[in-house]
């Protein structure tokens, strides 16, 4: 007979066996996951939260001390939006090592100087050590720091190539980069997911101008030339040195001009020569032409000063010019008119992107009347215009001169008017009228005619600065001077009739002959509206690459280069 106790034993043994089996089934995957550290197991759940927490903490702080410029608060929202869709998963790391895309991107960051940028802004020299540390440490915190560091550096690089490092509004320039800003999280996700064409994809966000690409090529050339610059200075001659004169620096000037390409390599200059002549004079003329100097071959103080500028400084001029190209809009509704202030030059572009018209200009005085940098649209022309004296000139010049000489206004073909244009006085000025002028109740304008300060035509593009293009009664010889920062802020045109005809070329009735008649024989203050506004850019670039590849350098007449260089030296976060 079987007892109750003996019958219960098989059940108890089965129960024990079942629980042992169940424990084994559950335990094996956990162990496997912990061993492999892969995706989808409890081990991954153990590891991913730690990495995720580290990523979140680094992003939320907006600061990463591993970076050369640790504060990335200006990019914090973009970085967070980049990681959020993936649940804060690592982007640049796979199997405890940088991904192929990470290595490709770092190589581009390390070569940022070819774009006129500073590789150290993107930790260029730090990535080799980071790669080695990442592959040896296997630390979740280290992986998170690496990943966030690369994300921040890549975002900075993309933004810098696209719109520049510093917002031009920081310098009170009227240029808008906001419309060009990229959706950085979206763009970067595309960049990471695409397996080919990284450099081509990045090239799509660069300024599309041929001038930008030419300037970048010139930068590469001058970076190499700067390596050969020994820094030795040319001696200043005792006075202006003409062809045939004696000069102790013949060997040095020949070496300098050969290096930068103005003196042919095969030009024969005796090593012990002390005579300034022949090929050297021709080379100096070429140099002068490229540096905004009168190309007469005279070795002047200004010429020697420009020859002594270190080539590293020329490299910096090219870099700053590339930065300013990034501030410009990338497309235009009509071919634009562009005025480059340091060059004293205007260019009007055709639909094919070629220069259709170019001329010299005079710009605002460097001390009191700097012409501002901004963009607008030319809307109309006024032939034989009045000159409405700007408040500043009225206050600082016309009123004091009138107080000393009550005939000043009539002698200068001016008249006093009410704000709505009603003439109050055009003869000697009374005390009452002078008092109203001082109080701002009356204003002054100059009558139309060849002696008018605006000449015979003005070209209007609305702006807060009261700046426009116009003719001038001054001698045409002034447009061949080296220094042409001479105006009260407006831009004087060397060939005003040609620009007027160019702007009106879509109006068949306004041929060049009619433009000339309107200027010299037409009605006073006659307005002609353009069919469509023509974009105009007033820009500032001290390095210019011509269509033939010739590189030209100009003086920093307003100190804008110095201001930009100083601001860039401060590092991130740059003013946005």
Language-model features and meaning:
Residues 32-78, 82-84, 148, 152-156, ...:
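Well-ordered beta-sheet/strand-loop patches within structured domains
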Residues 15-27:
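Bacterial N-terminal signal peptides
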Residues 115-179:
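Mature extracellular/secreted ectodomains of secretory-pathway proteins
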Residues 4, 25-28, 32:
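Serine/threonine-rich, low-complexity intrinsically disordered segments
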Residues 102-113, 150, 157-158, 215-218:
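Short, Φ-rich (hydrophobic/aromatic) sequence segments
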